[in-house]
């Protein structure tokens, strides 16, 4: 499943809305049927106008004359503008990590032992558009794994090489679990499979280490910080599955498998990062 960012799409499937769609919204169907109101940019309301120069828009951000929604659309506009640069940087960093990163090389070797192969052909960098819903949620991701296609890295969401290393490690744990246990990755039959691989991926990838939580997400908690991070990110990822009803359902499923999956560090002897 996708490496979640702070806001991930919910997996509920409410009844179809019957009201007329407003001009600044478009309905998007995701996760097996959920209907979300995705906001398009309205320069008169947001202050962001793609027809003006980058520096004019940047000045609006500095002076507070661009709304939070406008800043979201401005950022997405820059991602589109800089797509070629971001893809080139992502591919260079990916290749470097496959040559020199201990965790990436180790996971690649373990996947090979199970008959799989990960390389530039099935670990691909792409621009992944985020979307802003009418209720203010940002739907985005840093990467994703598909048993049929391999690993997707969202080049525009990757901050630096260390972030890419964590993202690759997360998705490679999913690939390992798929090859070793043939897990029900998307949770079509059993959400507990999805919950277990998400717990393991967040635990083993390094994305929940204290320094990233503190300096990256502003969470300075010391007691139980690691466990809380792994649990919350697993819940977010399970929540995004189509068969998950709501956050309460996701929490229940994660709790059901927590003890066995949180203690399972395979293929590592212990938590590496």
UniProtKB/Swiss-Prot annotation:
A divalent metal cation binds at residues 170, 174. GO terms for cellular component: mitochondrial inner membrane. Residues 17-27 have a biased composition (Basic and acidic residues). The active site is at 171. Residues 1-11 have a biased composition (Polar residues). It is an enzyme of class 3 (hydrolase). It is found in: Mitochondrion inner membrane. The keyword Hydrolase applies. One of its GO terms (biological process) is mitochondrial proton-transporting ATP synthase complex assembly. The keyword Transport does not apply. Disulfide bonds: none annotated. It comes from the Eukaryota. Keywords: Hydrolase, Membrane, Metal-binding, Metalloprotease, Mitochondrion, Mitochondrion inner membrane, Protease. InterPro entries: Peptidase_M76_ATP23. Residues 1-33 are annotated as: Disordered. It is a peripheral membrane protein. GO terms for molecular function: metal ion binding; metalloendopeptidase activity. It holds the Pfam family Peptidase_M76. Its EC number is 3.4.24.-. Belongs to the peptidase M76 family. PANTHER family: MITOCHONDRIAL INNER MEMBRANE PROTEASE, MITOCHONDRIAL INNER MEMBRANE PROTEASE ATP23 HOMOLOG. Has a dual role in the assembly of mitochondrial ATPase. Acts as a protease that removes N-terminal residues of mitochondrial ATPase CF(0) subunit 6 at the intermembrane space side. Also involved in the correct assembly of the membrane-embedded ATPase CF(0) particle, probably mediating association of subunit 6 with the subunit 9 ring. This is Mitochondrial inner membrane protease ATP23. It comes from Pyricularia oryzae (strain 70-15 / ATCC MYA-4617 / FGSC 8958).
